[in-house]
Amino acid sequence: SVVKSEDYARPSYVDRRDYPLPDVAHVRHLSASQKALKEKEKASWSSLSMDEKVEKTVVGAAMFFIGFTAILVILEKRYVYGPLPHTFDKEWVAMQTKRMLDLKMNPIDGLASKWDYEKKEWKK
């Protein structure tokens, strides 16, 4: 059998988190229905059928309401909700954790079971 080598003259597609939308198409060989859809994308909006116009309107309305909801959430977080309680401060959490360790709370399988009381450090 003959091994086919990759064409390195063309850009290659790789799924990576740091580059989510590469310049390469996900599908290299389009089917007949996909080619027809590509040609339809180039046409005018007025050439759409009534069902397609209704579908476009529904999707547009859904996106509008999702965006409006996002704006409401941002405004609520900024102007409605107050600041976080002092118990969320890092210093408070550190004091609370130290107190839990001093009281040896849940020594079997909890936080105190992972603390070495002789060395005063977390077990490894």
UniProtKB/Swiss-Prot annotation:
Membrane topology category: Single-pass membrane protein
Gene name, Swiss-Prot/TrEMBL: COX4I1
Protein location: Mitochondrion inner membrane
General function of this protein: Component of the cytochrome c oxidase, the last enzyme in the mitochondrial electron transport chain which drives oxidative phosphorylation. The respiratory chain contains 3 multisubunit complexes succinate dehydrogenase (complex II, CII), ubiquinol-cytochrome c oxidoreductase (cytochrome b-c1 complex, complex III, CIII) and cytochrome c oxidase (complex IV, CIV), that cooperate to transfer electrons derived from NADH and succinate to molecular oxygen, creating an electrochemical gradient over the inner membrane that drives transmembrane transport and the ATP synthase.
Superkingdom in the source lineage: Eukaryota
Name of the protein in its database record: Cytochrome c oxidase subunit 4 isoform 1, mitochondrial
InterPro entries in the record: Cyt_c_oxidase_su4_fam (IPR004203), Cyt_c_oxidase_su4_sf (IPR036639)
SUPFAM superfamilies (UniProt xref): Mitochondrial cytochrome c oxidase subunit IV
Residue positions, PTM N6-acetyllysine: K4, K35, K42
Organism: Saimiri sciureus (Common squirrel monkey)
GO biological process: mitochondrial electron transport, cytochrome c to oxygen
N6-succinyllysine: modified positions: K4, K35
The family this protein is said to belong to: Belongs to the cytochrome c oxidase IV family.
Quaternary structure annotation from Swiss-Prot or TrEMBL: Component of the cytochrome c oxidase (complex IV, CIV), a multisubunit enzyme composed of 14 subunits. The complex is composed of a catalytic core of 3 subunits MT-CO1, MT-CO2 and MT-CO3, encoded in the mitochondrial DNA, and 11 supernumerary subunits COX4I, COX5A, COX5B, COX6A, COX6B, COX6C, COX7A, COX7B, COX7C, COX8 and NDUFA4, which are encoded in the nuclear genome.
One GO cellular component, as annotated: mitochondrial inner membrane
Gene3D superfamilies, per database record: Cytochrome c oxidase subunit IV
Pathway participation: Energy metabolism; oxidative phosphorylation
Keywords noted in UniProt: Acetylation, Membrane, Mitochondrion, Mitochondrion inner membrane, Phosphoprotein, Transmembrane, Transmembrane helix
Residue numbers of Phosphoserine PTMs: S31, S33
